[in-house]
Amino acid sequence: MRLWLLEKRKYREKTQDYIAYKARISRSMYAMIESGERNPSVPVAKKIAKVLNFDWTLFFEE
């Protein structure tokens, strides 16, 4: 579970649907990324990070 990602999304009061829409991925893909089931590609990591305003390399520090 990527709690840090969940916390960033909740802090900004955004839904998984909203983040997925803005990042141009499916909600199910975003849910799998947030839960830690899947790792995002670099382009997807950059899109999610842009929407939530954080450094995309956080995805790859785990």
Where do the model's predicted regions map?
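Key DNA-contacting residues within the recognition helix of helix-turn-helix
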Residues: 6, 31-32, 60
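Helix-turn-helix DNA-binding elements, focusing on the entry/boundary residues of the two helices
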Residues: 5, 16, 27, 42-45
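Residues in the helix-turn-helix
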Residues: 18, 29, 58
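Recognition helix of helix-turn-helix/homeodomain-like DNA-binding domains
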Residues: 25-40
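DNA major-groove recognition helix of helix-turn-helix/homeodomain DNA-binding modules
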Residues: 24, 43-58
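Short basic helix-loop element that most often maps to the first helix and adjoining turn
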Residues: 3-22
